[in-house]
Amino acid sequence: MAKRDYYEVLGVSKSASADEIKKAYRKLSKQYHPDINKEAGADEKFKEISEAYEALSDPQKRAQYDQYGHVDPNQGFGGGAGGGFSGGGFSGFEDIFDTFFGGGGRQQDPNAPRQGSDLQYTMRLKFKEAIFGKDAEIEIPREENCDTCHGSGAKPGTTPEKCSHCGGKGSINVEQNTPFGRVVNKRTCQYCNGTGKEIKEKCPTCHGKGRVTKTKKIKVKVPAGVNDGQQMRVSGEGEAGINGGPNGDLYVVFVVIPDEFFEREADDIYVEVPITFVQATLGDEIDVPTVHGKVRLKIPSGTQTGTTFRLRGKGVPHLRGNGTGDQHVIVKVIVPKKLDDKQKEILREFASTTGDKVDEQTSGFFDKMKRAFKGD
């Protein structure tokens, strides 16, 4: 089944800004998160949303998706199997020079040590886990050298032989007609897949591959302060090296599940807290939740809806240490929806002392008041 367009998944246009993509992701991830939405299919929908956001929130991956319609899982990670174009034709300036000048200056030893491929793992974190960090254990399927043949691919007691087709070079020269005439192009030997070796008797465990897929448990220490879309490198935990080369690296990409109450911007946290009309008018002290615990906040008399208070040091620890962000508390004045006659009379008396005209029947005083407090 073909994957849906990532922009369609998030409900945004292809020209959407990074902020629009982030807002769409937050809204949808709250709606379909498996801990909140128990409907059938919500889990798959959440995975689809996370996959789309992971691609479109990264400028490099988004550009690749816009151009090719897919994202290379190794995009942005060095040491792997290389992106871009592969196969026949010219693969770069070296190939062009090889073609016209005999190809003798770029011969590589197919048996030289090579670094293993890098791996990528997506780790989903709860909002507070990203803020305070955690110790986690993850399972990674990866290719490792076969224990039976020690990576040679040959049956124990035997050794691989030099490939009879390429003479152990791992490549063969192929004549090709081009607009410049007949030229010779170097191709990977299809008989030995570029290894320069032939295995007459294959290892019964790995069937001649020299490598097997194993699931490795890896302990990962998630640092405090990581944010959505950031990645962490775990050195040497990628796939095994080839011909004795070093292992690749593991890149852990973090996807942070949005919180229903707190909203994060960099290392600062924003919350909206409701207060009553009386509290806003006369002032009060209220309890405000923070990720660090409950804090008392003084509301001055005459506070207007939308007023922002800063709680210093109650935000996210800086990823590289040295301080903590702040929490910004935005108050929303809640207008009572139902008033009895006595309460209405008190408000009319109050309005008359300030010179306001009150005509509930013609002006819809309370509706206007509600809209004003909401900022409409």
Curated annotation (Swiss-Prot):
Secreted listed as a keyword: no
Cystine connections: none
Cofactor binding notes: Binds 2 Zn(2+) ions per monomer.
Keywords noted in UniProt: Chaperone, Cytoplasm, DNA replication, Metal-binding, Repeat, Stress response, Zinc, Zinc-finger
Cofactor(s) listed: Zn(2+)
Binding residue positions for Zn(2+) 2: 163, 166, 189, 192
GO biological process entries: chaperone cofactor-dependent protein refolding; DNA replication; protein refolding; response to heat
Entry remark concerning the domains of this protein: The J domain is necessary and sufficient to stimulate DnaK ATPase activity. Zinc center 1 plays an important role in the autonomous, DnaK-independent chaperone activity of DnaJ. Zinc center 2 is essential for interaction with DnaK and for DnaJ activity.
Similarity comment: family membership: Belongs to the DnaJ family.
Subunit comment: Homodimer.
Name of the protein: Chaperone protein DnaJ
